[in-house]
């Protein structure tokens, strides 16, 4: 919904949109089901809660709720718990799946890149075991490909909105306290000074002359600073293990000539959505 024109109408007339037909009604239904599921899980945690031995985030939140139950201004409420769990659940699944989908599309478009990744997988991991995170440091090309996928697709072009907590002087500008700030990650990820030919998918953007992985402060796929994505470590791990596992066991085959594969996003709003594409997974 947030990456379609419907979001503009929803923001202006949230109560009316539910009466119009469209795929957004499926989204609303799914959100209701997700909220119901989360509430059921919270109730299970309430029944099994051990104040001296909390097991997870929900347990810790419930304990904090109990401690602040007499504080009328507490942010530790049931509604905030449900919303936070839903945010973590949705943000931790949709972004990773979209990145992986877009990554497979780019590898389909560039078979020469796929071949180099598979050669590195054969050399470092082999075929007789599953990949692990310790392999990543010995796979600079694969690491560069993963970074280039995230840089190129520019999954969250405008980042999430922030608010200035105090008056800030930035260069010649005064930003008053309370000002909403929307930053452009695109301007960094597609900076031509840091990434030559930023509009081209090229893993060399993250490789030095010796073929070693090259870090750069301009890689901000997860934002930066104190408000950096809290799931960055998990997302990096998931993307590496999933992509390597797929290419370890399968060769990607397009149903059309790679030259005719469209890699432009089907829609670019809050998220960059990859276009629909059919592909074949041929066991290695």
UniProtKB/Swiss-Prot annotation:
<dbReference type="InterPro" id="IPR017972">
    <property type="entry name" value="Cyt_P450_CS"/>
</dbReference>
<dbReference type="InterPro" id="IPR001128">
    <property type="entry name" value="Cyt_P450"/>
</dbReference>
<keyword id="KW-0492">Microsome</keyword>
<dbReference type="Pfam" id="PF00067">
    <property type="entry name" value="p450"/>
</dbReference>
<dbReference type="GO" id="GO:0005789">
    <property type="term" value="C:endoplasmic reticulum membrane"/>
</dbReference>
<keyword id="KW-0256">Endoplasmic reticulum</keyword>
<dbReference type="GO" id="GO:0006082">
    <property type="term" value="P:organic acid metabolic process"/>
</dbReference>
<keyword id="KW-0408">Iron</keyword>
<dbReference type="GO" id="GO:0020037">
    <property type="term" value="F:heme binding"/>
</dbReference>
<dbReference type="GO" id="GO:0006805">
    <property type="term" value="P:xenobiotic metabolic process"/>
</dbReference>
<dbReference type="InterPro" id="IPR036396">
    <property type="entry name" value="Cyt_P450_sf"/>
</dbReference>
<keyword id="KW-0479">Metal-binding</keyword>
<comment type="similarity">
    <text>Belongs to the cytochrome P450 family.</text>
</comment>
<feature type="binding site" description="axial binding residue">
    <location>
        <position position="229"/>
    </location>
    <ligand>
        <name>heme</name>
    </ligand>
</feature>
<keyword id="KW-0503">Monooxygenase</keyword>
<dbReference type="GO" id="GO:0005506">
    <property type="term" value="F:iron ion binding"/>
</dbReference>
<protein>
    <recommendedName>
        <fullName>Cytochrome P450 2C31</fullName>
        <ecNumber>1.14.14.1</ecNumber>
    </recommendedName>
</protein>
<dbReference type="GO" id="GO:0016712">
    <property type="term" value="F:oxidoreductase activity, acting on paired donors, with incorporation or reduction of molecular oxygen, reduced flavin or flavoprotein as one donor, and incorporation of one atom of oxygen"/>
</dbReference>
<keyword id="KW-0472">Membrane</keyword>
<dbReference type="InterPro" id="IPR050182">
    <property type="entry name" value="Cytochrome_P450_fam2"/>
</dbReference>
<dbReference type="InterPro" id="IPR002401">
    <property type="entry name" value="Cyt_P450_E_grp-I"/>
</dbReference>
<keyword id="KW-0560">Oxidoreductase</keyword>
<comment type="function">
    <text>Cytochromes P450 are a group of heme-thiolate monooxygenases. In liver microsomes, this enzyme is involved in an NADPH-dependent electron transport pathway. It oxidizes a variety of structurally unrelated compounds, including steroids, fatty acids, and xenobiotics.</text>
</comment>
<keyword id="KW-0349">Heme</keyword>
């Amino acid at each position: 919904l947030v990456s379609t024109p419907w979001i503009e109408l929803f923001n202006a007339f949230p109560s009316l949109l539910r009466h119009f037909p469209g795929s957004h009604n499926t989204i609303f239904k799914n959100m209701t089901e997700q909220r119901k599921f989360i509430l059921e899980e919270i109730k299970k945690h309430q029944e099994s809660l051990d104040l001296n031995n909390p097991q997870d985030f929900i347990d810790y939140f419930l304990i904090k709720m109990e401690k602040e139950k007499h504080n009328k201004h507490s942010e530790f409420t049931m509604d905030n718990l449900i919303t936070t769990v839903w945010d973590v659940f949705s943000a931790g699944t949709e972004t990773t799946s979209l990145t992986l989908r877009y990554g497979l599309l780019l590898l389909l478009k560039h078979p020469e890149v796929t071949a180099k990744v598979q050669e590195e997988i054969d050399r470092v991991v082999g075929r007789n075991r599953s990949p692990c995170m310790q392999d990543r440091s010995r796979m600079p090309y694969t690491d560069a490909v993963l970074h280039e996928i995230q840089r190129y697709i520019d999954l969250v072009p405008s980042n999430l909105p922030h608010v200035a907590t105090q008056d800030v002087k930035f260069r010649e500008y005064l930003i008053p306290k309370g000002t909403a700030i929307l930053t452009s990650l695109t301007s960094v990820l597609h900076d031509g000074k840091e990434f030559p030919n930023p509009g081209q998918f090229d893993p060399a953007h993250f490789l030095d002359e010796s073929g070693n992985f090259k870090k750069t402060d301009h890689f901000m796929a997860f934002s930066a600073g104190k408000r950096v994505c809290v799931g960055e470590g998990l997302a990096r791990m998931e993307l590496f293990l999933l992509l390597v596992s797929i290419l370890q066991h399968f060769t990607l085959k397009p149903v059309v000539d790679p030259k005719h594969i469209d890699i432009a996003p089907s829609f670019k709003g809050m998220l960059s959505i990859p276009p629909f594409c059919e592909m074949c997974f041929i066991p290695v």
